[in-house]
Amino acid sequence: MALRNKAFHQLRQLFQQHTARWQHELPDLTKPQYAVMRAIADKPGIEQVALIEAAVSTKATLAEMLARMENRGLVRREHDAADKRRRFVWLTAEGEKVLAAAIPIGDSVDEEFLGRLSAEEQELFMQLVRKMMNT
């Protein structure tokens, strides 16, 4: 079977197209940063370690990303007074502003791709992805 007909090759191409479109529309915010900001907005003061899943990254990579975001003034982190190993994360006012502007753009990029499928196909697609991820 030709490589162009392999499922994971096509998925990789799809993700590359989506990422290129994302970077064009939101050049100052990566998809992992966006996902982390959405998770923080959903649960202000979230424990840093809980953001690993949202970032789809390692603990070290997440810590580096949050440090960069903190330097940009998008998030603030605080240590737990009782346990310095624990850190909690909030969006700053600037982070809230950036996220508020990014959400409709990110949704639009996603819809540009998902809109190629009917509502039924979108539901089936999500079911199949969840099944393959075993969740």
From Swiss-Prot:
Transmembrane segments: none annotated. Keywords: DNA-binding, Transcription, Transcription regulation, Virulence. One of its GO terms (molecular function) is DNA binding. It comes from the Bacteria. Induction: Expression is modulated by temperature, growth phase, salt and pH. Residues 4-134 form the HTH marR-type domain. Residues 48-71 bind DNA. Signal peptide: none annotated. Coiled coil: none annotated. The keyword Transcription regulation applies. Involved in the temperature-dependent positive control of flagellum-driven swimming motility and cellular aggregation. Regulates fliC expression by directly interacting with fliC promoter. This is Transcriptional regulator HosA. The lineage of its organism: Bacteria, Pseudomonadati, Pseudomonadota, Gammaproteobacteria, Enterobacterales.
